[in-house]
C-alpha cells in the first residue's frame, strides 16, 4: 500500500521542467530529445546549432540566442563555425567564393551524379565476402551533359547481384567526366574498391571511376558555403530544401536509407504485387538522392553567379 501511495503521489505531481544539458546531445542525440525540446521554434542561427562546439550550451544559457551573440572566446575556431558565425552576423548565406571556385574547377562534363544503397552482412552469404561486408543492391545515376541534358539510369536486384551490379555500373557511367558523389570516402568510393577486391577482373575499371570522383559534401563540411537554414546539418536531406522548395523527401514512401534497407530485407518474403511496390519505392528514394545532388550542385553554381 505504501508503494502504491508513493507511486500515485509521483504520478500526480507536476512534471519537472526539462533542462538542457550536454548529455542531451552527447554522442547521439537522446531519443527523447524532441519530447523535451522544440527545436522547430528556435531561430535558424540558434547558438544551439553551432557545430562541434563544447561551449554552445553555456553560451545559450548565458543569453546568447543567436550564434552572432556568442562570446568570441567560446568558439573553437573551425572553418565551419566561422561560416556559421558570418552567416548569422550578415543574415545571409556565407560563401568563400575563391575556395568554391577552386573546388568547382575540378568538375568536368559529363557529370555523373551517383548514389548506392547496400545492406551489411555479419555472416558472409556469398563467396569472396568477409564478415560485415556490404552488398550493394541499388544504384541511381543521373548524367548531365554540357548542353544541360539530364538522363537517369538505375539498378535494383536481390540475391548475389554483385557482378551484375558492377557490370551495370561500368556500362552506364560515362568513361570521361566527373563522378559527383556525396560523402564518397565512406560510401560509394569504398564500395567500388571493395567490389574490385571481390572481382579483380574489374578492379582497374572500377578504380578509374574512383579516380574521377569528387565529393559534393566538401564545400559544406569545410565551411566553404553555409546557409543558416541548414541549422547546423548538411546531409542531402537537409540541403535539398535550402536550394529548392520544389522537391522533398517527406512525401516519399521510403524517405531514408535505413527504411530502404528494411524494405530490401523484406523483398524476398513479399508477394509479387508487394515486391513491385517495394522495388518502386526504393528506386524512387535512390533517384531522389542523385537528383538532390544535381539540385545542390547547381544551387552552389547559382550562388556563385550572384556574388
Describe each PLM feature range.
Residues 1-45, 239, 243-307:
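Acidic, Mg2+-coordinating catalytic module of metal-dependent nucleases/exonucleases
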Residues 1-4, 152-258:
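Conserved DEDDh/DEDDy metal-dependent 3′-5′ exonuclease domain
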Residues 42-86:
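Helix-hairpin-helix
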Residues 62, 114-117, 142-144, 181-183, ...:
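Generic beta-strand/beta-sheet core signal
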Residues 78, 119-123, 148-150, 186-191, ...:
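Flexible loop/turn segments at secondary-structure boundaries
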Residues 98-175, 197:
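Conserved RNase H-like, two-metal-ion catalytic cores of nucleic-acid enzymes
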Amino acid at each position: 500500500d505504501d508503494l502504491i501511495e508513493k507511486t500515485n503521489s509521483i504520478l500526480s505531481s507536476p512534471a519537472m521542467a526539462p533542462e538542457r544539458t550536454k548529455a542531451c546531445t552527447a554522442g547521439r542525440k537522446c531519443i527523447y530529445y524532441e519530447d523535451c525540446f522544440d527545436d522547430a521554434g528556435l531561430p535558424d542561427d540558434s547558438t544551439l546549432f553551432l557545430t562541434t562546439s563544447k561551449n554552445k550550451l553555456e553560451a545559450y544559457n548565458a543569453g546568447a540566442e543567436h550564434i552572432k551573440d556568442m562570446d568570441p572566446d567560446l568558439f573553437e575556431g573551425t572553418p565551419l563555425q566561422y561560416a556559421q558565425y558570418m552567416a548569422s552576423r550578415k543574415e545571409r548565406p556565407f560563401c568563400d567564393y575563391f575556395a568554391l571556385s577552386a573546388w568547382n574547377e575540378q568538375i568536368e562534363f559529363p557529370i555523373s551524379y551517383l548514389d548506392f544503397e547496400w545492406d551489411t552482412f555479419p555472416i558472409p552469404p556469398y563467396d569472396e565476402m568477409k564478415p560485415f561486408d556490404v552488398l550493394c543492391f541499388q544504384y541511381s545515376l543521373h548524367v548531365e551533359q554540357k548542353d544541360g541534358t539530364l538522363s537517369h539510369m538505375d539498378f535494383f536486384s536481390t540475391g548475389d547481384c554483385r557482378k551484375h551490379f558492377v557490370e551495370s555500373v561500368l556500362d552506364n557511367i560515362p568513361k570521361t567526366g566527373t563522378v559527383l558523389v556525396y560523402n564518397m570516402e565512406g560510401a560509394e568510393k569504398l564500395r567500388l574498391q571493395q567490389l574490385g577486391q571481390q572481382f579483380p577482373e574489374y578492379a582497374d575499371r572500377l578504380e578509374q571511376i574512383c579516380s574521377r570522383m569528387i565529393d559534393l559534401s566538401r564545400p559544406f563540411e569545410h565551411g566553404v558555403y553555409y546557409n543558416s537554414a541548414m541549422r547546423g546539418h548538411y546531409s542531402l536531406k537537409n540541403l535539398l530544401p535550402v536550394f529548392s522548395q520544389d522537391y522533398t523527401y517527406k512525401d516519399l514512401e521510403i524517405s531514408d536509407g535505413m527504411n530502404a534497407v528494411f524494405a530490401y530485407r523484406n523483398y524476398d518474403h513479399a508477394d509479387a504485387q508487394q515486391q513491385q511496390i517495394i522495388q518502386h519505392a526504393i528506386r524512387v528514394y535512390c533517384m531522389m538522392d542523385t537528383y538532390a545532388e544535381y539540385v545542390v550542385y547547381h544551387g552552389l553554381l547559382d550562388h556563385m553567379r550572384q556574388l
